[in-house]
């Protein structure tokens, strides 16, 4: 329900029964009051409980004939109309790791910062048998007042937990979702219902849950939105089929496909850095940028998740979504506005300007066992949940190109891997050499020192730094490369919000800028599907690399093929 218009602070009353076709009747003292649309407020549902309170007549009423004293009889009803809508957040898959480690803590952080509406409840739904108190005990183990150390932290935590409830059921049972709906209505108490469902479940049961939500648990008077976690299919065909199935039950604006990397602080800051600083925007093209590197590395392997990971691999898990979405944000043209659709339109244009990846532009690897000191690290296929003959890549590097006037000829290099020497995620922009550089003899043949580089470190230790050439103090002429460094932990006090906090708040507010639209998803899959099919059909053997190393040697040859050196492998960044 939209907010009711008022005249002299007297709210409108919209009665559905026997209402003239041109809209709802308005109680007014001023002829300037406007009518409200009948469909806007009723949402097509029968007369609601609020309208039936206090024996209010439902026959046509002529506004001008109302006795002013009748206003007193309507005050309880008018007060109920003014109540804030309820917000019900339903975490489907509440007993899973993602819900416990990320979703519930993010919701508590939003509550802690007073970002949730007054009338909110959180419901957990899963197959696990549990009651409300058991859910609260489970949630409480992962909640922390990490933002700061206010004295009322414990009190806030207790208040949040009292808003948390649980309903057990099967994901494909409409009856179980009807039971959930009854519990939701009990908490909503006849007020306007807004419902947000977070699907923290395996993708093979997405459609069952969406069907049950649509048929039995959607809001009768407000909005219903569904957040969907990746993976969104395995290739173009399965992704399109998933989207088609969703749209049998939901409209596109109800579907919030989440990629939590787009909620990272440094990724969010990327467009601000570019479009609000004159020093960068003129340089953002092939004229000044030599290459762009998007790097994701983890210093641990699959460790127990091998069975799940083996079905997808590093390309589907990281490159096709996280890194490609960041690339689109980095390379897009200036949008008309900051409106969600304007930004998403520009990102889709970037993806459609790219050619599908070919096998010769990709290197795949898989980590093997390695001993370091007195400690031994198991290889990928040593995991008991992984087939011994698996060729699923745990590392991939790729070179992509954008065929448009801004980026023609600029290689965009992606690299993602597990069990590497460090954990990091960053965007590295290497600029071209200075034409006719007066100091080139001082640099010698060291390519690194001759190149300016802008680095956005997404994690850990968020930072933005620009590598520049500088004279070392002294009598001689010796040049050194140094950093102009913005380290977030030094410059800004307080902890940076988690990506899930930002994205959950955006979904609640209906802000879609950081969520993935269906056409963008389709464009992303079209780039990687031919490559994935070729890898699987030919059973391409990945290059082995030791656990804890810098990855397969082939990645260096791929970069050298495009006259690039990986920026994260220089001595100063190791």
UniProtKB/Swiss-Prot annotation:
Compartments where found: Plastid, Chloroplast
Keyword Chloroplast annotated: yes
Activity-regulation annotation: Regulated by metabolites. Post-translationally inactivated by cysteine-mediated redox modification via the ferredoxin-thioredoxin system in the light and this avoids futile cycles with photosynthetic CO2 fixation.
Keyword Transcription regulation attributed: no
Gene Ontology CC terms: chloroplast stroma
One GO term of the biological process aspect: glucose metabolic process
Binding site for D-glucose 6-phosphate: 230, 260-264, 298, 317, 418, 423, 459
EC number per UniProt: 1.1.1.49
InterPro entries assigned: G6P_DH, G6P_DH_AS, G6P_DH_C, G6P_DH_NAD-bd, NAD(P)-bd_dom_sf
Catalysis: reaction(s): D-glucose 6-phosphate + NADP(+) = 6-phospho-D-glucono-1,5-lactone + NADPH + H(+)
Ligand binding (NADP(+) 1): 93-100, 127, 230
GO molecular function terms attached to this record: glucose-6-phosphate dehydrogenase activity; NADP binding
Sites where the protein binds NADP(+) 2: 415, 424, 428, 457, 465-467, 550
Pfam short name (any one): G6PD_C
Assigned keywords, A-Z: Carbohydrate metabolism, Chloroplast, Disulfide bond, Glucose metabolism, NADP, Oxidoreductase, Plastid, Transit peptide
Pathway of action: Carbohydrate degradation; pentose phosphate pathway; D-ribulose 5-phosphate from D-glucose 6-phosphate (oxidative stage): step 1/3
First-tier enzyme category under EC: oxidoreductase
Active site, UniProt feature: 322
Disulfide bonds: 145-153
Gene3D superfamilies: Dihydrodipicolinate Reductase, domain 2 (3.30.360.10), NAD(P)-binding Rossmann-like Domain (3.40.50.720)
Function: Catalyzes the rate-limiting step of the oxidative pentose-phosphate pathway, which represents a route for the dissimilation of carbohydrates besides glycolysis. The main function of this enzyme is to provide reducing power (NADPH) and pentose phosphates for fatty acid and nucleic acid synthesis which are involved in membrane synthesis and cell division.
Oligomer status and interactors: Homodimer.
Family: Belongs to the glucose-6-phosphate dehydrogenase family.
Name of this chain's protein: Glucose-6-phosphate 1-dehydrogenase, chloroplastic
Protein species of origin: Spinacia oleracea (Spinach)
UniProt gene name: G6PD
